[in-house]
């Protein structure tokens, strides 16, 4: 948005249906929202030693998921409003450079060609698929799957010690996974 604030014609290419990239849509923001739930559960348990007993938490996964989505929607909606207010054009899809000053975006509605003088690349990330793991197995989740919070398995193994993996381990443990 800073480019638009400085008077430059600005276009954002976004692969998700809402602005915010990986962090806001399928990364740090949904993870932090779920981590907040885990923290509240753990703090409630810890208060027992101070004489305040809440009992075992009863979790409604559907309501937790809905709340997490509400957090995401509120923030992505805010970004959409900021983009509109600054007259930033948003093109949804995946972009690839086709020339020194040309980007081709493949989206749901076909291809869009964008000509530009300057480009800022903020490509985000995506989960890696390890070749020795059967990804078609519904028990195998990547971080995006874990953030969807479809179920709380009885037991969960987290491979990888990145921040999202650590946070998801914390969340699922607080929700009852071993």
Language model regions located:
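Glycine-rich flavin
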Residues: 2-9, 14-152
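Rossmann-like NAD(P)H-binding beta-loop-alpha module
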Residues: 150-178
């Amino acid at each position: 948005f800073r480019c638009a604030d400085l008077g430059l014609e600005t276009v954002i290419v976004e692969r998700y249906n809402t602005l915010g990239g990986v962090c806001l849509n399928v990364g740090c923001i949904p993870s932090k929202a779920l981590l907040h739930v885990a923290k509240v559960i753990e703090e409630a348990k810890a208060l027992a030693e101070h004489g305040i007993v809440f009992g075992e938490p009863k979790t409604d996964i559907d309501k937790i998921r809905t709340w997490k989505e509400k957090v995401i929607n509120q923030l992505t909606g805010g970004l959409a409003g900021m983009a509109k207010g600054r007259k930033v054009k948003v093109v949804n899809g995946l972009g690839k450079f086709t020339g020194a000053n040309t980007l081709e975006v493949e989206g749901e509605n076909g291809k869009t060609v964008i000509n530009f003088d300057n480009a800022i690349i903020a490509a985000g990330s995506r989960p890696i698929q390890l070749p020795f793991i059967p990804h078609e197995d519904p028990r195998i989740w990547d971080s995006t799957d874990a953030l969807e919070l479809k179920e709380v398995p009885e037991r969960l193994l987290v491979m990888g010690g990145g921040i999202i993996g650590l946070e998801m381990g914390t969340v699922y443990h607080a929700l009852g996974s071993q």
